[in-house]
Amino acid sequence: MSLIRALHQQLIDQEISAVAVAQASLARIEAVDDRLKSFLQVTAPQAIAQAEKVDAQIAAGEPIGLLAGIPIGIKDNLCTKGIVTTCASQILRGFVPPYESTVTEKLQKAGAVMVGKTNLDEFAMGSSTENSGYQVTANPWDLTRVPGGSSGGSAAAVAADECLIALGSDTGGSIRQPASLCGVVGMKPTYGLVSRFGLVAYASSLDQIGPFARRVEDAAILLQAIAGHDSRDSTSLDVPIPDYTQALKPDLKGVKVGVIMDAFGEGLDDTVNEAVQTAIAKLRELGATIEEIHCPRFRSGIAAYYVIAPSEASANLARYDAVRYGLRAEADNLMEMYTHTRAKGFGAEVKRRIMLGTYALSAGYYDAYYLKAQKVRTLIKQDFDQAFTKVDVLVCPTAPTTAFKAGEKTDDPLSMYLSDLMTIPVNLAGLPAMSVPCGFDDNNLPIGLQLVGNVLGEEMLFRVGYAYEQATTWHDRQPDLSA
């Protein structure tokens, strides 16, 4: 059952008020977030004001949309007018955007209640949310472990029931990997389906905004609300947005599922492999035909990504110069102001990626690195195109492991980067993909199944994800934070 629909019905039947729902969400945050640290800031006054508007509409007999009165967390790299937006970086400490991002604007119009801005790896660069310039978010299933990243705050908040749904951004796996590690549904839409206007850029050709939820149907409802063309984003797709919930069916008769064989093997935990194989068997039980698919360049994605993404980041992050907003370091002249501010304001991982990108784009190395990486990107896209001539949807693990201990990989960037081995190729190809819970390991840590669709294949992903969810009970399990 959709949690959004259930709450929506209670609201319109006036069994509960939107203000009471908002207060319950805020109380939950107050009760558990000192341990979790999912939120960088809680926007209680704005949440109550929005909820009061929804209650007034209901009292006046006006119709309300499905998201009206629903508590939502917003990743803190999405601009919110009049509300501090930091990207979890000291360089943007205290920055208040003068405008609203397209997605948050749409959510406001839909009546959704933003309860706060969620933590992330600084500028969305990381796989554990340990790179935040402010705090480290814990995994609700085991507070000594990471929630994944970079959208770890959003994933943890939804898993811990601090909010019903949340928004994240996904550049190389930043929605799907934390969704897997926190046991929730996370979706990265087709590149261009959701406007990036107001999303603070990391790698512009890869970034995409998407939903977190505890049910597939709720993710579909949230995507429905934020998708659509926007003239303020030149990469926005001008395509009709279907009603994604119409695609939800309890069986998979006639659906062809391809298993990405290249995702299995070295680096994959045995428990993750077992859970995913069991999930694939369940898809077959539901009526799908299963076929082995080879994407020969699948594992080359990570090498190409760590040239392309830092290159774009080095250009995008050049704008933080301390002139108009954010941190400004003391200096005797302009050049010193730039260098001192950036040295002080950016964290180690952001500096690492800026340097990598600047190097890859430099004269004499551009052809050897950046151009070659773009060629590999094209080949990866061709592999996926070839696969989708045979099947409707592809499956593989979302992440090679379950949640690792905080601090375990901070001194080993390469090991950390491998957390996104399965998710990165999808971003390089601009495809939609979703992680759905498919099991737990021996430590009671969640495992995610990644579903990959063709361009604009969101309906098929929701269909497969929903059918699998209906046939299993993984989504019913919740972390115990009562201690």
Curated annotation (Swiss-Prot):
It comes from Synechocystis sp. (strain ATCC 27184 / PCC 6803 / Kazusa). Keywords: ATP-binding, Ligase, Nucleotide-binding, Protein biosynthesis. This is Glutamyl-tRNA(Gln) amidotransferase subunit A. It is an enzyme of class 6 (ligase). It catalyses: L-glutamyl-tRNA(Gln) + L-glutamine + ATP + H2O = L-glutaminyl-tRNA(Gln) + L-glutamate + ADP + phosphate + H(+). Allows the formation of correctly charged Gln-tRNA(Gln) through the transamidation of misacylated Glu-tRNA(Gln) in organisms which lack glutaminyl-tRNA synthetase. The reaction takes place in the presence of glutamine and ATP through an activated gamma-phospho-Glu-tRNA(Gln). InterPro entries: Amidase, Amidase_CS, Amidase_dom, AS_sf, GatA. Pfam families: Amidase. PROSITE patterns: AMIDASES. One of its GO terms (cellular component) is glutamyl-tRNA(Gln) amidotransferase complex. Heterotrimer of A, B and C subunits. GO terms for biological process: translation. The keyword Methyltransferase does not apply. HAMAP family: GatA. Belongs to the amidase family. GatA subfamily. SUPFAM superfamilies: Amidase signature (AS) enzymes (SSF75304). GO terms for molecular function: ATP binding; glutaminyl-tRNA synthase (glutamine-hydrolyzing) activity. Its EC number is 6.3.5.7. The active site is at K75, S150, S174. The keyword Nucleotide-binding applies.
